[in-house]
């Protein structure tokens, strides 16, 4: 496939990962992408670079560069400007596209977050290149082409997409799809600085104020340590409260399988599976979920999977670590009661032991 690449793109090399900052901290998906980017770079025999964009002198950008090297980057690109203090599409797009045009990476990876999706789309459009969104697997073929795999047709098929005649090859990956690599104390590589050639007057959007999202009801399932989810086996929408009660008792979050979203019982941000959230909690409790392959793909990275289902032949028992053949509607309240008693202060030390 590479042999058909136009001549002007044949000198593109190296793998880049955009390091996303969230409230001054590196977003976990960027660390996951550094681990995946390291594998791709090693297969191609090229360098892995972290790309950091932010305000000058900020502790966040310094930490981002340190994390990039600790998780596998050989070098980092840094764009600093007061215009980059907060995310706005125009200056971030300008910074990243100018970097790409000047340094010619072969592969550019971003997290499929709200920010990453917005930035990736505008950068790909500006550069007139291809973008494969929400990938679940990344690899390189024998000729070095990026093979970006993502679910399609509602998760019933996996499609591998190639960017044949454009560069860079761009892809976004959802949080928790890739494993988090080990942090390693490595020598600091080169830091290449680049100026943002833009004026405030050229930017249409202005940041006026920030409002705390501490009361937000939006799910953050991708990074929850404990997740309790329900499926059609719950029978009625009012039984979702059983999930919420158990999740609250365990200090976790709650979600559901795709059919409950289709019924309108829960919003899409609570959907778990190949076409929803991919999760890697320490404990995953699935109540009344049959365990179709699309759901399995989204949860199989969990440390411990506990399945509750009335059907002993349900597919979920094939990959659950612990299985309970029971009616989830009656079993969940009993389980919540047991954990509530066990987690009382006087019993907590004994429970942990």
Curated annotation (Swiss-Prot):
<dbReference type="InterPro" id="IPR014729">
    <property type="entry name" value="Rossmann-like_a/b/a_fold"/>
</dbReference>
<dbReference type="InterPro" id="IPR018206">
    <property type="entry name" value="ETF_asu_C_CS"/>
</dbReference>
<dbReference type="InterPro" id="IPR029035">
    <property type="entry name" value="DHS-like_NAD/FAD-binding_dom"/>
</dbReference>
<keyword id="KW-0285">Flavoprotein</keyword>
<feature type="binding site">
    <location>
        <begin position="283"/>
        <end position="311"/>
    </location>
    <ligand>
        <name>FAD</name>
    </ligand>
</feature>
<comment type="similarity">
    <text>Belongs to the ETF alpha-subunit/FixB family.</text>
</comment>
<keyword id="KW-0614">Plasmid</keyword>
<dbReference type="Pfam" id="PF01012">
    <property type="entry name" value="ETF"/>
</dbReference>
<dbReference type="Pfam" id="PF00766">
    <property type="entry name" value="ETF_alpha"/>
</dbReference>
<dbReference type="InterPro" id="IPR001308">
    <property type="entry name" value="ETF_a/FixB"/>
</dbReference>
<dbReference type="InterPro" id="IPR033947">
    <property type="entry name" value="ETF_alpha_N"/>
</dbReference>
<keyword id="KW-0813">Transport</keyword>
<keyword id="KW-0535">Nitrogen fixation</keyword>
<dbReference type="GO" id="GO:0050660">
    <property type="term" value="F:flavin adenine dinucleotide binding"/>
</dbReference>
<keyword id="KW-0249">Electron transport</keyword>
<dbReference type="GO" id="GO:0009399">
    <property type="term" value="P:nitrogen fixation"/>
</dbReference>
<dbReference type="GO" id="GO:0009055">
    <property type="term" value="F:electron transfer activity"/>
</dbReference>
<keyword id="KW-0274">FAD</keyword>
<dbReference type="InterPro" id="IPR014731">
    <property type="entry name" value="ETF_asu_C"/>
</dbReference>
<comment type="subunit">
    <text>FixA and FixB form a heterodimer.</text>
</comment>
<dbReference type="InterPro" id="IPR014730">
    <property type="entry name" value="ETF_a/b_N"/>
</dbReference>
<protein>
    <recommendedName>
        <fullName>Protein FixB</fullName>
    </recommendedName>
</protein>
<comment type="function">
    <text>May play a role in a redox process involved in nitrogen fixation.</text>
</comment>
<dbReference type="GO" id="GO:0033539">
    <property type="term" value="P:fatty acid beta-oxidation using acyl-CoA dehydrogenase"/>
</dbReference>
């Amino acid at each position: 496939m590479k042999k058909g690449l136009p001549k002007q793109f044949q000198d593109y090399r190296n793998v880049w990962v955009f390091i996303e900052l969230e409230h001054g901290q590196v977003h976990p998906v960027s660390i996951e992408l550094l681990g995946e980017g390291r594998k791709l770079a090693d297969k191609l025999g090229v360098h892995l670079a972290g790309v950091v964009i932010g305000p000058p002198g900020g502790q966040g950008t310094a930490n981002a560069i340190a994390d990039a090297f600790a998780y596998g980057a050989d070098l980092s690109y840094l764009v600093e400007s007061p215009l980059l203090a907060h995310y706005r599409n125009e200056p971030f797009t300008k910074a990243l596209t100018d970097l790409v045009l000047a340094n010619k990476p072969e592969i550019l990876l971003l997290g499929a977050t709200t920010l990453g999706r917005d930035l990736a789309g505008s950068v790909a459009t500006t550069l007139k290149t291809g973008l494969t969104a929400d990938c679940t697997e990344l690899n390189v073929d024998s000729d070095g082409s990026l093979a970006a795999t993502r679910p399609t047709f509602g998760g019933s098929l996996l499609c591998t997409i190639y960017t044949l005649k454009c560069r860079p090859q761009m892809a976004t990956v959802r949080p928790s799809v890739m494993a988090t690599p080990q942090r390693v104390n490595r020598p600091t590589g080169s830091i290449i600085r680049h100026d943002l050639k833009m004026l405030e007057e050229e930017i249409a959007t202005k940041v006026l104020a920030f409002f705390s999202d501490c009361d937000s009801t939006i799910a953050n399932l991708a990074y929850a340590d404990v997740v309790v989810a329900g499926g059609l086996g719950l029978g009625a929408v009012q039984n979702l409260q059983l999930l919420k009660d158990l999740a609250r008792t365990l200090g976790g979050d709650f979600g559901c399988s795709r059919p409950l979203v289709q019924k309108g019982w829960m919003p899409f941000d609570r959907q778990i599976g190949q076409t929803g959230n991919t999760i890697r909690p320490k404990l995953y409790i699935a109540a009344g979920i049959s365990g179709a392959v699309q759901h399995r793909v989204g949860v199989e990275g969990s440390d411990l999977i506990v399945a509750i289902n009335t059907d002993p032949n349900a597919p979920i028992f094939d990959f659950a670590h612990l299985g309970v053949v029971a009616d989830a509607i009656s079993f969940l309240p009993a389980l919540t009661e047991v954990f509530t008693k066990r987690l009382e202060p006087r019993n907590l030390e004994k429970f942990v032991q």
